[in-house]
Amino acid sequence: MRFKTVDLPYHVYIGENVISKLPKVLRSLDANYFLLLTDEVVKNLVVVNLKETLKDFEYDMMLVESAKMEEARKIVLRGGFADYDAVVGVGGGKVLDVSKVVSSELNASMISVPTTASHDGIASPVASFKENGKPISISTNPPSAVIADLNIIKNCPIRLLRSGYGDLVSNISSVKDWQLARDLVGEDYNEVAASIAVMPAQLMVSKADELDLTLPPHLLMLLRGLIMSGVAIAFVGSSRPASGAEHKFSHALDYLGYGNGTHGEQVALGTIIMEYLHEKYYGRGDWEQIKMSLEKVHAPTTAKEIGLTREQVIEALMLATKLRKKRFTILEAVKPTKEEFELVVEKTGVA
């Protein structure tokens, strides 16, 4: 029998005022001296209120200016001789992604303190950047702890919460793609990781009629789902449970520089399209339910809402069929033509 070591977040706190748990988490990680990474806005809104909480600890604070590998390298160089016990990232995706890379490079524990709930990077072992306008993903160590305080996150723009909903819902089509790869090309499949990723997404979709993402109980559901999505990725050491053809579509939009959508908004549109294909060819998609659930939370369901034309959507879909060919998805299984994509975006109302 073979065994594999899996690194997962050791502490996860989600709720109101859980930022008060930060000293406890730091002590449990023997982090007497740490690096706190944040940005200018969060520093003035959130970090300024942590001074009393952190009065018994020694720490340095640096500001993250951009979501780039070069930014992470600069911080590593500046802090390379400090011998930090931990890196505490307080902020949105930009800060958390840089914090993951810095903590991995410095061989220090990472504590994720999100101020938004816009995607599953809160707890995942993946950092996403744009280099020369192109998206890249970097494998990192997962956070050792996640502290998601509802009193902080509820103040982020509602668009970012809807984006997080879109990213979580995309797991439904991602897992279907993984199952296709298992059935058609014999890819390894992990039922536990798949369930961890897809069950919270299915729960949110089933409750879309009553969801108000600004209410603490519903925001709690969203955060749990996004954190579990990150844990599923860490569990198998791959983004497979949470990234399928819908993410290829989003990456294609990023490569082409089209539109003004967030990551979650782009993958949500991609999910509607890929669910249509799953339903048409394999009878196990439900694009109408996905679209309806996105509409219920007022997330975009059309290209126009995120600054895309029909032609740009089709071009991105065609490019998506050429990206990451080793990741088998519905696109590799059915090889849609441009004409079919045109039919799909019309039938679904995406464009």
Curated annotation (Swiss-Prot):
Gene3D superfamilies assigned: 3.40.50.1970, Dehydroquinate synthase-like - alpha domain (1.20.1090.10)
EC number: 1.1.1.261
Protein name per the record: Glycerol-1-phosphate dehydrogenase [NAD(P)+]
Cofactor binding remark: Binds 1 zinc ion per subunit.
Binding site residues for NAD(+): 93-97, 115-118, 124
A GO BP annotation: glycerophospholipid metabolic process
Binding positions (Zn(2+)): 167, 247, 263
Pathway: Membrane lipid metabolism; glycerophospholipid metabolism
Swiss-Prot/TrEMBL catalytic activity: sn-glycerol 1-phosphate + NAD(+) = dihydroxyacetone phosphate + NADH + H(+); sn-glycerol 1-phosphate + NADP(+) = dihydroxyacetone phosphate + NADPH + H(+)
Main location: cytoplasm
Compartment(s) of residence: Cytoplasm
PANTHER family named in the record: GLYCEROL DEHYDROGENASE, GLYCEROL DEHYDROGENASE 1
Organism, as annotated: Archaeoglobus fulgidus (strain ATCC 49558 / DSM 4304 / JCM 9628 / NBRC 100126 / VC-16)
Gene: egsA
Keyword Ribosomal protein among UniProt keywords: no
GO cellular component, one term: cytoplasm
Top-level division of the source organism's lineage: Archaea
Cofactor: Zn(2+)
Residue numbers binding substrate: 120, 167, 251
Keywords, alphabetical: Cytoplasm, Lipid biosynthesis, Lipid metabolism, Metal-binding, NAD, NADP, Oxidoreductase, Phospholipid biosynthesis, Phospholipid metabolism, Zinc
Gene Ontology MF, one: metal ion binding
Function: Catalyzes the NAD(P)H-dependent reduction of dihydroxyacetonephosphate (DHAP or glycerone phosphate) to glycerol 1-phosphate (G1P). The G1P thus generated is used as the glycerophosphate backbone of phospholipids in the cellular membranes of Archaea.
Family to which the UniProt record says this protein belongs: Belongs to the glycerol-1-phosphate dehydrogenase family.
Coiled-coil ranges (or none): none
